């Protein structure tokens, strides 16, 4: 029997990321797990309006999304616990300016530089609509075709209902394989 859990947001886990922003020569970092794909070249970064980083993103119209692995988790969690309005977080991560002009964390295994094209505001959140301009990955986390290999990347995942971090799991199978097998078994009647 299923139980009604009320209006619980249960689309988790999500990748843990650190958003980088720069405004007036100052870099700030913020742990953000509410990042989602909304098109083949677009993503949305959803940040509570109380965050100091939001105004920096609004000013520059650019941000970086840095994937978090276990080696950087303590510092990534830290930049989500303290406000950039009160704490200078610029030196928490060694970083460089990426080709798109955003601060990129050196040790992040994969980072995306983004141009902010829109902001969909709700009562409490800025939802930045972003166009990915550059994706930068360490060579040791890519496959032989140069695409990200998440078994090598091992991104940290965030689970909101349990308020915890998770490790990524094993590959179950290639996408579309189960559906094609099912179609063959049912003679494609569905």
Segments the model singles out, each with a brief description of its role:
Residues 1-190:
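Basic, polyanion-binding surface patches
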């Amino acid at each position: 029997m299923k139980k009604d859990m009320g209006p619980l947001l249960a689309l988790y886990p999500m990748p843990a990321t650190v958003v980088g922003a720069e405004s007036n020569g100052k870099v700030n970092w913020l742990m953000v797990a509410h990042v989602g794909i909304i098109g083949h070249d677009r993503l949305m970064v959803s940040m509570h309006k109380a965050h100091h980083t939001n105004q920096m993103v609004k000013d520059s119209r650019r941000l970086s999304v840095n994937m978090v692995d276990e080696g950087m988790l303590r510092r990534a969690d830290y930049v989500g616990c303290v406000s950039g309005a009160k704490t200078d977080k610029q030196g928490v991560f060694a970083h460089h300016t990426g080709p798109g002009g955003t601060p990129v964390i050196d040790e992040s295994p994969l980072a995306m530089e983004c141009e902010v094209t829109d902001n969909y505001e709700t009562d409490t959140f800025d939802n930045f609509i972003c166009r990915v301009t550059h994706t930068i990955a360490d060579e040791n986390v890519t496959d032989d075709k140069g695409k990200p290999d998440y078994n090598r990347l091992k991104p940290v995942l965030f689970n909101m209902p349990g308020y915890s971090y998770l490790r990524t799991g094993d590959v179950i199978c290639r996408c579309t394989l189960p559906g094609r097998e099912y179609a063959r078994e049912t003679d494609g009647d569905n």
